[in-house]
Amino acid sequence: MTLLRAFDNRGIDVSHLYDPDNILDTKKKQIQEEWLDNTNIAEIANKIVEEVDQIVATHVSQTFGEVQRPNDGALELREKLKQRPDVGIPLYGPLINTVTRGARLRKLYLRSAPSGYGKTRTMVADVCYIGCDEIYDEMFGWIKNGTAEPVLYITTEQELEEIQTMMWAFISGVDEDHIMNNRYEGDEEARVDKAIEILARSKIYIIELPDFSLRDVENLIKQNIRENGVKYVCFDYIMTSLKILEEIASRTGGVKLREDNILFMLSRRLKDLANEYGVFILSGTQLNADWRDSETPDQNLLRGAKSIADSIDLGMHILPVVQKDLEGLETVLAANTFDKPNVKISVYKNRRGRYKGVYLRTKADYGTCRFRPMFATTWDYEIITIEDLKIITEDEGAFGLE
């Protein structure tokens, strides 16, 4: 009753679900009361929200499907690219922004990994790099870091305390083990204290969502766009849940869908939300067992459904370096120009991007969540010449190239 009253107070007529003023039609009153008693509050809320969405879809004009000419808006686009290149706020790490052109609005990026190889840690790093205005640099100390954009982090596995210590480690450059064991060296404790202060003034919002439906994810993203001005969303990670299975069964009248279809629907909805609300979304998946032997690490390694990759703008896998990699890189490493990599990041899809079918050879410090690509090769170990693109953020939402 409280939920229905709240909708009614907002001017939404819910009398077709329950009409408290009805005293004459006893049969209708009994049917409505039985429905309320046997329906949980989430289903009631979703039903009302779906009805509102249908009204919006019917009466709000859409620009999709209109016939257009190749020269429509061409001069304006050319001038816009002169003033502001097609880049987004920078992500963390050398070479990453050369490949991705930053976290671009209306784009969906997917970064997957086997369990335990850094999917969450790299996402935490990007959340902090987007949302914090200072970060500790091993060479220069505390340095300014952009404009601290509003960012939402939805975690499906880790609790808040687990996320917090990873964030402290990344921002301060202090190994998480030192934080967890309360055994600091030198000025590390002071750096962690400052990291906590930086997070306190940031615009980072964290939501724990261990069991979720498609509607839950959509509502949380829309709510934080509306209430917190969020433009960057990190969702860890794309998977099936009991609630999604129940939701799909309810929508399809009990028809069961395969896991790959459900995962495709979730990734498709994330991409639609990115387009509809003009936000950037970063997500991830687990990998299947084939990652150990694959020489072409592409979408076929995605656990559950390779069709997830159909909806994304950028696809990457984080993979461990094996002996075969070190043998293939022997000549490069012998020159002592680079440290020995312990991680390789495979870029298998890059819509409107130059680099794909490549590895970013990376030195990963799991303790501080800092993954630093050093150089790039093809999947066949051929060295690629690649510059480290610097994206400059001077004003909120305004980016340029250095």
Give names to the regions the model predicted.
Residues 1-74:
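Short, small/acidic-rich helices and loops at N termini and domain boundaries
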Residues 60-174, 401:
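The Walker A/P-loop phosphate-binding site
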Residues 98, 133-229, 299, 359:
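Cytosolic-facing regulatory segments adjacent to core modules
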Residues 153, 234-235, 279-285:
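Structural recognition of the conserved hydrophobic beta-strand(s) that form the central parallel beta-sheet
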Residues 160-164, 241-247, 290-293:
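Short acidic/His/Gly/Ser-rich catalytic and metal-binding motifs that mark active-site loops
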Residues 173, 177, 181, 214-230, ...:
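C-terminal regions of RecA-like/P-loop NTPase motor modules
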Residues 198-205, 269-281, 311-313:
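A structural motif corresponding to the C-terminal end of an alpha-helix
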Residues 205-273:
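Phosphate-binding/switch loop-helix module in NTP-utilizing enzymes
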